[in-house]
């Protein structure tokens, strides 16, 4: 599955599906595929890598996602930062992603890089937030 996800000659939908399956089977083995997909020319492949990363509880995906914040495509960058928020629980200033330019996103990537450089040695991926059970009434 990992090799299929990384293969630039494979159909995009096949690669995206291969990544989803690989994450379900053993997420700890997927950062290498996510890294390859994050650099793909096809923006839907990059978005799939950014989105899928939120289910990979490995520190190795954090710098990959940080690098994706400055992506040319806003929707890829937004997916990357949402995955970062989910994985790290790191709170950042509010930024207007809808109106952002590539220069804005490069600045925001620098903010995340600075944070990561200070945290990466000791950082532990926190437990995922659990949804509160609905109160029966």
Residue ranges and their predicted role:
Residues 1-7, 27-39, 58-70, 90-98:
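Amphipathic alpha-helical scaffolding segments comprising HEAT/armadillo-like alpha-solenoid repeats
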Residues 9-11, 41-42, 72-73:
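Short inter-helical turns and helix N-cap capping residues of alpha-solenoid HEAT/ARM repeat scaffolds
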Residues 18, 49, 80-83, 112:
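Conserved hydrophobic register position within alpha-solenoid helical repeats
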Residues 21-24, 52-55, 83-86, 115, ...:
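Core register positions within helices of long alpha-helical scaffolds
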Residues 69-74, 85-89, 102-105:
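TPR/TPR-like (Sel1-like) alpha-helical repeat modules
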Residues 93-137:
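Terminal, low-structured helical/coil segments at or just beyond the last alpha-helical repeat
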């Amino acid at each position: 599955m990992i090799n299929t996800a990384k293969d630039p000659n494979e159909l995009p939908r096949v690669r995206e599906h291969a990544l989803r399956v690989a994450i379900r089977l053993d997420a700890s083995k997927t950062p290498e595929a996510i890294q390859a997909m994050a650099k793909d020319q096809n923006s839907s492949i990059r978005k799939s890598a950014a989105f899928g990363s939120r289910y990979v509880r490995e520190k190795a995906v954090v710098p990959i996602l940080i690098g994706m914040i400055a992506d040319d495509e806003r929707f890829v960058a937004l997916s990357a930062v949402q995955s970062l928020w989910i994985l790290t629980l790191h709170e950042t200033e509010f930024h207007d992603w809808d109106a952002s330019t590539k220069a804005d996103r490069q600045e925001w990537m620098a903010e995340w890089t600075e944070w990561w450089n200070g945290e990466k040695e000791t950082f532990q991926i926190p437990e995922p937030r659990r949804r509160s059970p609905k109160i029966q009434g």
